[in-house]
Amino acid sequence: MLVKDNKNIDFGYKIVKKKDKQNLVNNVFNSVADKYDLMNDITSFGIHREWKNNLINWMAPQKNQKLADIAGGTGDIARKFLNNGGHSAYVIDINEEMIKSGKVNKKNLKNIEWLVASAEDIPIDDNTFERATMGFGLRNVTNRAQALKEVYRILKPGGRFICLEFSHVENELIEEIYNFWSFKCMPYIGEKVAGDRSAYTYLVESIRQFPTQPELSEMFSEAGFSRVKYRNLSNGIVSLHSGWKL
């Protein structure tokens, strides 16, 4: 990882001021919001849908449960939660363009609310939700420790949080292939489909800067979560991290 201090943080492979990172991330998602779901399908060969299904299957939604989908973007995970037995969902995202895109694509979905807000300062009362998720969003948060504490705060006692995030591949051969696809192909596709090569260069770089699976598990524990576990999917290309508020 790059060397950082109290005033600086990584933005991909660049070091930027902490106060500037959120605006830089917003610019990335403002640029690609209307093509975000399409690009997910193309760059993952549609496998991102199965990763999200794995999250929902591990969570096993119940009809009395309300979900907070933090950094929820266009609402894919919230939709799956509702379609698999959950009662209602809030999609919380700091980027208004992503929320707008989600509202258009999920306009016929009932029991869903949309909220523009930072994961580091969620304007929701303590002990509100039975379940919380974050899919491919924690990498983009400036203060990840604070975001995890906020998730813990808004969960009810007995509540559960599952985070789906790009992680670190453990097989050397798969890692070599994955690196070629990530660094050579994804930015090119981003340029041709979404009109923004730099956004997908940032995406690839931010994945490599993200904590390892054991490191993120430790962050969960430090935020207060109990029974912390993780599962690797696709040989560690992504992982699911689970923690409970007990």
Mark where each language-model region is:
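N-terminal auxiliary segments of SAM/dcSAM-dependent transferases
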Residues: 1-26
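A short acidic, Gly/Pro-enriched loop at the edge of an enzyme's catalytic core
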Residues: 120-131
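A short glycine-rich, Lys/Arg-flanked "PGG" loop and its adjoining helix->strand segment in the class I
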Residues: 145-160
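Hydrophobic beta-strand segment of the Class I
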Residues: 36, 132-133
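Core SAM-dependent methyltransferase catalytic element
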Residues: 217, 223-246
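Conserved alpha-helix/loop element of class I SAM-dependent methyltransferases that forms part
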Residues: 31, 35, 44-65, 80
